[in-house]
């Protein structure tokens, strides 16, 4: 049985979890996440609430991983992107009036 190396990452605003995992060839994304123990390190990670990707491309939990893959666990958005842009434009206009 061949062993491959993958990285499982989860980033919060102030801390990043980066776990190197040695796992059997033919394993899935879910297997690698379970092997990384990230589910026990933080309460923010859940298979039901977080999207998963490899190199910024969303994949399913049953996706077969390859040697060198970086499995990324994405956080849920805290604010709608349109709302954030509206707030940002409003603040920048307000600052221009002050200066």
Curated annotation (Swiss-Prot):
<dbReference type="Pfam" id="PF03658">
    <property type="entry name" value="Ub-RnfH"/>
</dbReference>
<dbReference type="InterPro" id="IPR037021">
    <property type="entry name" value="RnfH_sf"/>
</dbReference>
<comment type="similarity">
    <text>Belongs to the UPF0125 (RnfH) family.</text>
</comment>
<dbReference type="InterPro" id="IPR005346">
    <property type="entry name" value="RnfH"/>
</dbReference>
<dbReference type="InterPro" id="IPR016155">
    <property type="entry name" value="Mopterin_synth/thiamin_S_b"/>
</dbReference>
<protein>
    <recommendedName>
        <fullName>Protein RnfH</fullName>
    </recommendedName>
</protein>
